[in-house]
């Protein structure tokens, strides 16, 4: 190990930055974020760097560096494009025993800056020892996606209760087990879900009860998006990997289901038109029953759970029974499939609004507000509209929409099996029969469809027409 990782307390302490350009500004921002007072020396100083120093009550020395600029400093940064000057700053710092960093010159450094993931008070540092800084930044980028932004709040919660827990659990091993359970349990999940006050209340109750605790279940209502696993949110993926039970729909792609925790129980509750594997009211009750057993229940739905996903009905039942839940939105099919098909839903020249419409109603009909749907300057997106497509096209034309209005069918959008067929209201039902189009298929109607010829970028199954 060429460098020993340490964390340096700079709160209220003086740091010298030699240099006044963009590079010096970047280093100065890091120092200021750590609470350091800045002394900047350079003949010319970047305007933003000047403001940064002034805001922090630091010192601006608009002149050349001098050997006497170091007194009182606990850290020195050389950030100029003058190599002899940088070497001089390094020699002077080393002679005085002051840690020094010279930008892009590891051999002249006694300390180096890592790539930083900041979830203060939790901080993660990644370093290549100056040998491969780009690689360190790439690793940091991965960590940024893996570590939730609310981990800082979680660490802060632990800090506030640390001494009380130590009093209740004087044994080190017992404390370690306590914190491990807390960081992986419902209290941590409340923080990560954006409910820190609730988490603190639960922890208070837990400690007041002498650490006796009964596990409380929770339901995660998660949108799985339109099919491409890369479109999942970070939060969705995290919850998928910690749930005890998964209730999933027919529209959840197998590749997404595979990302769930391996040992989680999986229950298929999918539906298709006139064929419900599990009735909706039974799904609602099942969520309540499983969560009441203390289980973490993942309700995984294709697209977004609040857009034609009946998510509102499910959480209404949970709320009525006092079951904790959180909702994770997903990319809805209209947005995802249209984007992968190269069809912008709005466009300044073609559509100033977009309307999402269900293709069949609760009683199986397509009794829709047709007059509203033929208003100019709008794009229509029909979910579950394949069976009722002949009626949809007929009624739109009957109520004033041109039979030559561009329209598209997007089957299994955003996946490798995606197929897109474009036509008009007049021939769209015929395309379904000719190409044996099947569900899940999204229907888009509007002038924006004609832009697909120019904007299509995703290949999919390459059977488009």
Curated annotation (Swiss-Prot):
Residues with the Phosphoserine modification: 128
EC number: 2.1.1.107, 1.3.1.76, 4.99.1.4
Active site: 249, 271
Pfam families: CysG_dimeriser, NAD_binding_7, Sirohm_synth_M, TP_methylase
Pathway terms, separated by semicolons: Cofactor biosynthesis; adenosylcobalamin biosynthesis; precorrin-2 from uroporphyrinogen III: step 1/1; Cofactor biosynthesis; adenosylcobalamin biosynthesis; sirohydrochlorin from precorrin-2: step 1/1; Porphyrin-containing compound metabolism; siroheme biosynthesis; precorrin-2 from uroporphyrinogen III: step 1/1; Porphyrin-containing compound metabolism; siroheme biosynthesis; siroheme from sirohydrochlorin: step 1/1
Family under the similarity heading: In the N-terminal section; belongs to the precorrin-2 dehydrogenase / sirohydrochlorin ferrochelatase family. In the C-terminal section; belongs to the precorrin methyltransferase family.
Name under which the protein is recorded: Siroheme synthase
Organism expressing this protein natively: Pseudomonas aeruginosa (strain LESB58)
């Amino acid at each position: 190990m060429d460098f020993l990782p340490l964390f340096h307390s700079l709160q209220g302490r003086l740091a010298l930055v030699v240099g006044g350009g963009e590079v010096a500004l970047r280093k100065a921002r890091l120092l200021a974020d750590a609470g350091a007072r800045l002394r900047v020396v350079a003949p010319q100083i970047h305007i933003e760097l000047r403001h940064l120093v002034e805001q922090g009550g630091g010192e601006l020395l608009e002149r050349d560096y001098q050997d006497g600029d170091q007194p009182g400093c606990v850290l020195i940064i050389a950030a100029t494009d003058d190599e002899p000057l940088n070497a001089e700053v390094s020699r002077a710092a080393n002679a005085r025993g002051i840690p020094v960093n010279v930008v892009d010159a590891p051999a002249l450094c006694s300390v180096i800056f890592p790539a930083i993931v900041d979830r203060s008070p939790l901080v993660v540092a990644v370093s290549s020892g100056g040998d491969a800084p780009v690689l360190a930044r790439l690793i940091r980028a991965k960590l940024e996606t893996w570590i939730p932004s609310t981990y800082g709040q979680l660490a802060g919660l632990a800090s506030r209760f640390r001494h009380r827990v130590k009093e209740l659990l004087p044994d080190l091993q017992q404390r370690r087990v306590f914190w491990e359970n807390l960081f992986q349990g419902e209290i941590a999940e409340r923080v990560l879900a954006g409910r820190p006050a609730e988490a603190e209340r639960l922890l208070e109750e837990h400690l007041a009860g002498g650490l006796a605790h009964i596990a409380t279940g929770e339901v995660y209502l998660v949108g799985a998006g339109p099919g491409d696993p890369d479109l999942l949110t970070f939060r969705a993926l995290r919850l998928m990997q910690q749930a005890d039970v998964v209730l999933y729909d027919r529209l959840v792609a197998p590749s997404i289901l595979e990302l769930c925790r391996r040992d989680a129980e999986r229950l298929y509750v999918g539906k298709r038109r006139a064929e419900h594997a599990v009735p909706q009211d039974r799904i609602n009750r099942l969520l309540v029953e499983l969560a009441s057993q203390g289980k973490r229940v993942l309700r995984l739905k294709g697209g977004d759970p609040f857009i034609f996903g009946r998510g509102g009905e499910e959480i209404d039942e949970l709320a009525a029974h006092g079951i904790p839940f959180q909702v994770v939105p997903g990319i809805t099919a209209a947005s995802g499939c249209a984007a992968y098909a190269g069809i912008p839903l709005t466009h300044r020249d073609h559509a100033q609004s977009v309307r999402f419409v269900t293709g069949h109603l609760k009683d199986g009909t397509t009794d829709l507000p047709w007059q509203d749907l033929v208003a100019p300057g709008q794009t229509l997106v029909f979910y579950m509209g394949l069976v009722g497509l002949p009626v949809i096209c007929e009624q739109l034309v009957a109520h004033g929409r041109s039979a030559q209005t561009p329209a598209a069918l997007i089957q299994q959008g955003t996946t490798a099996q995606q197929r897109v067929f474009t036509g008009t209201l007049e021939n769209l039902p015929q395309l379904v029969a000719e190409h044996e189009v099947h569900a899940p298929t999204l229907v888009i109607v509007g002038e924006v469809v004609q832009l697909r010829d120019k904007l299509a970028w995703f290949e999919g199954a390459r059977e488009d027409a």
